[in-house]
Amino acid sequence: MILRLIAITGFLALVAVVSGCKCPSGGCVPRTPCVPCVLEPAEVDGQPPDLAALTCADCELIPLPAPKETYQLLSANTCQCSAATNAPVANMVELEHHWARVVIECDTNAVRENYCLDRDLMALHAVGIRNDSASAALKAFYQLAGLEAQEHFLQLATDETGRTLDRIDNLRERAITIPDGIDYGTVESRLHELKDQQLQLEFLRIQLNGQLQKLIGCPLDETTFYWPQVDWQVDLTPVDVEGALALGLATRGDLRGLELMICKIDKVTLPVARAVLAYADGTLGSVEPRDGLIHLARCFHCNKSELPIRCRQLAMLYSDTENLAIAEIKSAAYKIVLQQQRAANTQQTVEKLRGRVEELTKTRDVEDVAIFEISKARGDLYQVESKLIEQVVALEVAKVDLRKTQGTLALECGFDPKLCCEGCRARGRAGSLR
């Protein structure tokens, strides 16, 4: 009976091996789409098209969406923390973090140790994503604030240039000689350039509002416009570069994650170590012991060499990441120093031009100052006023960049991960593993 059962089992196994899967799609490799490169030769005259004649002159153009009488007020703190909270990828990582917790509660100790470490790394990664989202939102916030402020001075410059053009037309109609240095074509070109800048600002306003709506988790609506509430006081407080560096090295998620991995690496957590190394470079962690009794028996002693290799790799990765972090934080800090100096220089230029316009206006009747000279001085002032706003916005963006490189934007909104594996001092151990 037993022999008959063995024979039947062997026969069925043989039939399965011989017959196998038909696999009808595996017989040949299909052809891929291909279009031959056959183009018609021709001689061309090289003359550019007359676009002025080809453009429709009486077509009705659709205006860009523009703000109505009311805006929606938006503060920097609301913008920052809403973007950090509503970051979709970070929230998906949070769900993965929860699933790891579920597995930890019901599986073996080895699996529990791996997933506990993996869960902590996911928590740090989620905070990093929230940090990046808050940074992107704050940059768009300050850029939008600068745009709204610059639009005011751009409108003043446009009106002033239009009045200059009207004065030239008036002098022509009255057959009065136009003062030297005043060219109608130059002024008209300047007016068209200013109007084109206004159109570009209107489009950029739509883009920045849409970007903010996406980042802070609001419905996308091109007819809804935000008004950023910004304190325009120029902050020229000296930057403590070393203090900023010390804070950043203590709070950056990438360094905390590597410290955690170096602290907890052992034979059980080698799979997590391979994944961390692969995140830095695809070839790292790609070589791992094969499964199976034969491989285990033949490579039992060789497999012991993996742990010190992974420790050395993690120590080298930590050193490289730390050096990169130092460079990023210091660069961001000195960018603030640069923007402070640029804003201060532009502020001085604004004060000088304001004094110049005021002086010309007061002495207009006494010294017979031409109105065209006053108009030009006003135009120069409006241009530098707009430049000052640009410099102040760049200063605020530089401050955001520093907080981003320090990894503090999400922490400021309360996203401080509580790690179950953190505790040992990895920096000293990282040095000893090199």
Kindly give the residue locations of the regions a language model identified:
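Positively charged n-region of N-terminal signal peptides that target proteins for export
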Residues: 1-5
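Bacterial N-terminal signal peptides
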Residues: 6-17
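Acidic, low-complexity, intrinsically disordered peripheral segments
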Residues: 20-47, 63-66, 318, 385-434
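Short flexible linkers and secondary-structure junctions
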Residues: 22-155, 161-162, 168, 175-185, ...
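Short hydrophobic/aromatic segments of transmembrane alpha-helices and their interfaces
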Residues: 72-74, 237-239, 354-356
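Amphipathic alpha-helical coiled-coil segments
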Residues: 78, 90-105, 129, 135-154, ...
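Amphipathic alpha-helical coiled-coil scaffold segments and their short linker/junction regions
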Residues: 83, 181-184, 188, 218-308, ...
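Periplasmic alpha-helical coiled-coil/stalk elements that build and connect Gram-negative outer-membrane
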Residues: 108-111, 126-251, 261, 332-339, ...
